[in-house]
Every structure is written in C-alpha cells, then in structure tokens.
C-alpha cells in the first residue's frame, strides 16, 4: 500500500497519472479463524509482527491484527506528507533556477531590455526612458525627436515634400525658370553658332560682288537668317530622328544645372551676397538723397 501511494505521487513521463482510488477510512477487519479445522498446523496462526513473537495463540489474535492494520495508515501518512513537502520544495527551487537561466539566455542573445528608472525632474515630470515594467514610456513634449537620415532628407528634397528642408535660392517661380532658361540658352547657342559659321563667308561673297553700304548689310542679314533657319531645320531633324539619345543627354545636362543652381550657399558666398546687397542699398540711398551724402 505504501508503494502504491508513493507511485501515485511520483510523476510518470510515459503517460497520464492514474487516478488514485480513495482509501477506505478504516481497514475492514478480517476474521481470522484460528480453529484447528481451518488451520493446517500451528504455524498458520502465528503472529505476523515482531511484537507478537513468543506469545501463545489466543482468541484475541484477530483483534491484534485489526489494530496493527489500523496503525499502518497512520504511519504511512506522515511519510507521504514528507515526500509531498520535499517535492514542493524542489519545485520552488527549480523555478528561480529556470528563471535565472532564461534571463541569462536573453541577455546573451541581446533580447532583454535594460530596465532603468526614469529621472524625475524638480517639477515632478518624468524624462522619457524605459519604465520599470519594461515598456517604453511616452516621450514628453520637450523630448528631442529622431532626426531623419541623410537618405530620407535627399528623397524628400527630390520629391518636393512640404516638410523637407528648402534649398532653393529664390522663390518657386524663379526655380521653375531654370529648365526653361536652359532650353532657351541651348537654342540661342545653336543659332549663334550657325550665324557665326555663315556670317563671314556671306560677307566675303557680298564684298566680291560689290554690294556694300545699306544694301549690302540688308542682304547680309537676310542671307544669314536663311542660312541659320536651314541649319536649325537640319539640326532639329537630326534630334527628332534620335529623340531618346538626345533626351538622355539633355536630362544629364539639366541635372548638372539643377545641382549647381539649387545647392546651399556656403558661408563665404552668403557673406559676399550680404556685402553686395549692402553696397547696392548704399548706392541707391546715395542716388536718391544726394543732399544727405554731402
């Protein structure tokens, strides 16, 4: 019976623990018939305990067995309670050990947050930090915000977001004129190059023909216009024949112009700009009020 109860308390890894049958409140007395008819010899009715050795067989042997069987559960109960208390103590010791092992693993992996108390100012406000419970406290209004990275700033500036830092030297209208001015300057450069190529030959041809004076100048201007017009037509036909190549070339040139035009001015450039503006204002004041200058 003692081994059966001990087996019920011990854990069984191979299956469920079988429910223990409740023990009877008291053992049923067994009637022992010590008559000579049922017993084969005198040894059958011998006492089972060491205390009864040497006593003669009497009629009260059944009562002694009943009292011995009743004393067995009372002896077994404190032993079972001691085993249960030892098992609970071992579980209590295992829990802090396992918790310390888990905390050591988390610290080795870098997953455990370092807890610290928030510093309390004189006004009673807490500074942002990690709360003792392990959660992040909400940053106050005076806490510094995270600065965006350089890449995010560049992307925001390229997209023209409203929160991006403004690097424009002038207003938006002045910035929009950069691309139009570039196209205009390219056309002017092309036209001036064509005029420079055909101006001298036309002038020499008119001089050989003896066409000088106002008539020669008029003919020189008209012939230069026609030569530049045909030259522009030839160049534009070449550009329209290969639009992708020239568009890439124009885009690269425009990117270089925008990078130079929209860059932030340095300290020296800003100082020179302020000095030039101050000189211009002084000159305007002197021009407006000549009497004050004297």
Swiss-Prot record:
Residues 35-44 have a biased composition (Low complexity). It comes from the Eukaryota. InterPro entries: DUF4661. The modification Phosphoserine is found at residues 34-35, 71, 90. Residues 1-148, 268-294 are annotated as: Disordered. Keywords: Phosphoprotein. Residues 52-62, 73-92, 278-294 have a biased composition (Basic and acidic residues). This is Uncharacterized protein C6orf47.
